[in-house]
């Protein structure tokens, strides 16, 4: 999502740690007495899991309140696998919207048809900018950022998780380094954060990885230069960082930093974009909008690191703001400025030329800040 550049003295938000039940050590969970009880009396647990997997996703919070063992199953990665094998996975779109005054925001939830389902409980913690959102194991993570507390700008290391199955928020382990305006993406079930601004507003080159199994953050090899205002995407098991600025460039950086998660090392090329205001991955391609012109989008093919340009069917100002979403393998284009009056557009990359753009019936209650798609 778009991050905001902030200046001035920063300090770390240091709240008390609070870990959710779903993040406790697996061994300790299995040792509890409730794990010895059958999921459904009279049925083997494997069969019972298949029965539970047939329940519509909207009923998961109710299932999780039946008993501790049902809650444990609904939260597990295995349950997603069982639902996939049963052909019961449902794709939902989560959109963070903001009202016209820019003071209140909320997450709206829509099903695979774009029908509005509900709103999420309010995000915990103070209102922040410069944070990032990412999805891992069917859960939504809101990471770090910067906020105003008692008149001071505060760089945060907080990480909050929304469990889409239980409709609840919990606190995860803090980042090793408080940061905002950084790059973030999920690669092979792990979450990576790179660069950004730190506690005193300094530019960062450090990078960290989060392991959901252990609920821990660990440093990885740093970038060769500090970088901020950037974004990240994942392709073929690699982390691609581009856009933003660097201490070693005049203006915006076109450098593309690529992290090989298998080798644990970085390499770079000069084939990235500069100031990207919106991006989304659909299939094996990355779609971006540059801040200079919102009437076209640049499409990145990670296989050969090449770009192509696709025109947007828009009129009016070329600086009108937009944010991306994706649903059912198609790209959604939301207005990030409520007053523009733009409708939601849908782009099908697999459709024949001339038929790729359509108007979507999806309507948001405010302007779009960011969005993610979660399948469970």
Curated annotation (Swiss-Prot):
Protein name stated in the entry: F-box/kelch-repeat protein At1g67480
Domain F-box, residue spans: 37-85
Organism: Arabidopsis thaliana
Lineage of source species: Eukaryota, Viridiplantae, Streptophyta, Embryophyta, Tracheophyta
Keyword Repeat: yes
SUPFAM superfamilies: F-box domain (SSF81383), Kelch motif (SSF117281)
Keywords: Kelch repeat, Repeat
A Pfam entry, by short name: Kelch_KLHDC2_KLHL20_DRC7
UniProt-listed InterPro entries: F-box-like_dom_sf, F-box_dom, Kelch-typ_b-propeller, Kelch_1
PANTHER family hit by this protein: OS02G0202900 PROTEIN, OS02G0504900 PROTEIN
Chain segments annotated as coiled-coil in the UniProt record: none
Domain of life according to the entry: Eukaryota
Kelch repeat segments: 139-189, 190-237, 239-289, 291-335
């Amino acid at each position: 999502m778009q991050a905001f550049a902030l200046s001035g003295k920063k300090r770390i938000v240091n709240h008390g740690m609070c870990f959710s039940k779903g993040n406790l050590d697996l061994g300790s969970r299995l040792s509890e007495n409730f794990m010895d009880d059958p999921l459904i009396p009279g049925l083997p647990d494997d069969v019972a899991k298949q029965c539970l997997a047939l329940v519509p996703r909207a009923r998961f919070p109710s299932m999780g309140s039946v008993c501790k063992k049902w809650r444990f199953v609904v939260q597990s990665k295995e349950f997603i696998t069982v639902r996939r094998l049963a052909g019961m996975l449902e794709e939902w779109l989560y959109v963070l919207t903001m009202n016209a005054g820019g003071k209140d925001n909320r997450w709206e939830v829509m099903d695979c048809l774009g029908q509005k389902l509900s709103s999420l409980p309010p995000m915990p913690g103070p209102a922040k900018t410069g944070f990032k959102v990412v999805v891992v194991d069917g859960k939504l993570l809101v990471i770090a950022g910067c906020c105003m507390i008692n008149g001071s700008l505060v760089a945060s290391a907080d990480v909050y998780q929304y469990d889409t199955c239980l409709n609840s928020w919990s606190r995860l382990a803090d980042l090793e380094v408080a940061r905002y305006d950084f790059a973030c993406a999920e690669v092979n079930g792990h979450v990576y954060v790179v660069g950004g601004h730190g506690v005193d507003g300094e530019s960062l080159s450090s990078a960290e990885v989060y392991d959901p199994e252990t609920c821990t953050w660990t440093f990885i090899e740093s970038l060769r230069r500090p970088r901020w205002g950037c974004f990240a995407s994942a392709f073929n098991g690699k982390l691609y960082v581009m856009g933003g600025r660097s201490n070693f460039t005049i203006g915006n950086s076109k450098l593309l930093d690529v992290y090989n998660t298998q080798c644990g090392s970085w390499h770079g090329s000069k084939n990235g974009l500069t100031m990207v205001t919106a991006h989304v991955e659909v299939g094996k391609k990355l779609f971006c909008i540059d801040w200079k012109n919102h009437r076209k989008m640049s499409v990145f093919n990670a296989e050969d690191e090449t770009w192509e340009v696709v025109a947007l069917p828009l009129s009016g100002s070329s600086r009108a703001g937009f944010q991306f979403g994706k649903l059912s393998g198609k790209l959604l284009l939301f207005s990030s400025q409520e007053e523009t009056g733009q409708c939601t557009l849908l782009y099908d990359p697999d459709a024949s030329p001339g038929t790729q753009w359509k108007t979507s019936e999806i309507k948001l209650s405010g302007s779009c800040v960011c969005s993610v798609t979660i399948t469970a």
